[in-house]
Curated annotation (Swiss-Prot):
Reported cofactor(s): Mg(2+)
Annotated region described as Interaction with PCNA, given as residue ranges: 338-346
Identification of the protein by name: Flap endonuclease 1
Job description of the protein: Structure-specific nuclease with 5'-flap endonuclease and 5'-3' exonuclease activities involved in DNA replication and repair. During DNA replication, cleaves the 5'-overhanging flap structure that is generated by displacement synthesis when DNA polymerase encounters the 5'-end of a downstream Okazaki fragment. It enters the flap from the 5'-end and then tracks to cleave the flap base, leaving a nick for ligation. Also involved in the long patch base excision repair (LP-BER) pathway, by cleaving within the apurinic/apyrimidinic (AP) site-terminated flap.
Record-linked Pfam families: XPG_I, XPG_N
EC numbers on record: 3.1.-.-
Family statement: Belongs to the XPG/RAD2 endonuclease family. FEN1 subfamily.
Organism: Dictyostelium discoideum (Social amoeba)
Chain positions covered by the region annotation I-domain: 123-254
GO CC list: mitochondrion; nucleolus; nucleoplasm; nucleus
């Protein structure tokens, strides 16, 4: 689930709220990861060439396990502590969007079949990406894998990104790792995108800080939620003719969707037949999640060596040598990832002011200004 054109809107109106970073700089951070979007990325990355898709001896796809195993090891080797959150049932309001996706996937399957017979390799890859979906078994496989690796998982009652946001808002994790921008709409204080992008692509991680986004856009969180609905989300259709620029102008001026609709020229901007924005707003403000304080303490345990070998090597046909190497890396870096960042426990204590200091006169010799001027470096994301 995402918000249409929200990244572009933030980039244009609040560019300083987007920073670029690299994986190693998140050492010691606890990150709540939307497992579903991660799995989708793994499947796309490894199945783009359908002829080389990874499978076991039974012909079952194993790309999701390959991606999850090695990318998780990479996170842990950088000192990051991941928590994977899996989707539960989709909200009823999302059924319309799911039906649209199913129709698009059916059409893509037909196009893929035709492209495989007479099309170019580029066409095959394009349609192959569109037919990929994450199955229940693939989710269960990954839950089993992560448990054997000693990595904590959470099964959300509904949307994974909403559960991630709850965990972050309550201070149980530092950021949400997801490609879906609605993580910000749901209140995650920090969002990391491109967390699982291959470092070979040389694409930096994008870091969004919610408070900076709100300040840059000049909105409250409630107004930001209404803006997200107006831009378009998975829960309801958007108003045709209203793009990102017009949407933020309307919310900044009228402050709420009720007032926007009240002053809108309906002949020019007719409302969609199905536009339950009050219910959608409620889903963003009070999503169906497990309260963070009711979740068990997150623990990163030692890997189950015997269990990993049985599952990955015997059942899934992985290389025993590579699995052994992966397990050794898990053991090696587990203690590293348990260490905390210095800034997580250092508190600056201000020295009490001595009233006698005010009576002392200190004469300073003015220093000459330096001939050199320092240039400010910026890590904000700029669109090329």
């Amino acid at each position: 689930m995402g918000i249409k054109k929200l990244t572009d809107l933030i980039e244009d109106n609040a560019p300083t709220s987007i920073k670029t970073n690299i994986l190693k700089n998140y050492f010691g951070r606890i990150i709540a990861i939307d497992a579903s979007t991660s799995l989708y990325q793994f499947l796309i990355a490894m199945n783009a060439d359908v002829s080389s898709a990874l499978t076991n001896q039974l012909g079952e796809t194993t790309s999701h396990l390959q991606g999850m195993f090695y990318r998780t090891i990479k996170l842990i080797s950088r000192g990051i502590k991941p928590i994977y959150v899996f989707d539960g049932s989709a909200p009823v309001l999302k059924s319309g969007e799911l039906a649209k996706r199913q129709a698009r996937r059916k059409e893509a399957k037909e196009n893929l079949k035709e492209a495989t017979e007479v099309g170019t390799n580029e066409e095959v890859q394009k349609f192959a990406k569109r037919v990929i979906t994450v199955t229940r078994k693939q989710n269960e496989d990954c839950i089993k894998l992560l448990t054997l690796m000693g990595v904590p998982i959470v099964k959300a009652p509904c949307e994974a990104e909403a559960q991630c946001a709850e965990i972050v808002k309550k201070g149980k994790a530092w950021a949400t790792g997801s490609e879906d921008m609605d993580s910000l709409t749901l209140g995650s204080t920090v969002l990391l995108r491109r967390l699982f992008f291959s470092e070979a692509k040389k694409m930096p991680i994008l870091e969004f800080e919610l408070q900076s986004v709100l300040e840059g856009l000049g909105l409250t969180q409630d107004e930001f939620i209404d803006l997200s609905i107006l831009l378009g989300c998975d829960y309801c259709d958007s108003i045709k003719g209203i793009g990102p620029k017009r949407a933020i102008e309307l919310i900044q001026k009228h402050k709420s969707l009720e007032e926007v609709i009240k002053h809108l020229d309906k002949s020019k901007y007719p409302l969609p037949e199905f536009f339950p924005y009050p219910e959608v707003r409620e889903l963003f403000k009070n999503p169906n999640v497990i309260p963070a304080d009711q979740l068990p303490p997150f623990q990163w345990k030692d890997p189950d060596v015997e269990g990993l070998n049985k599952f990955l090597v015997e059942e899934m046909g992985f290389s025993d040598v590579r699995v052994a190497q992966g397990i050794e890396k898990l053991k090696k870096f587990k203690n590293t990832s348990v260490q905390s960042r210095m800034d997580s426990f250092i508190t600056v204590i201000k020295k009490p002011e001595d009233p006698n200091d005010k009576k002392k006169k200190v004469t300073k010799t003015p220093s000459k200004p330096s001939a050199k001027t320092s240039k400010k470096s910026s890590s904000t994301f700029k669109r090329k």
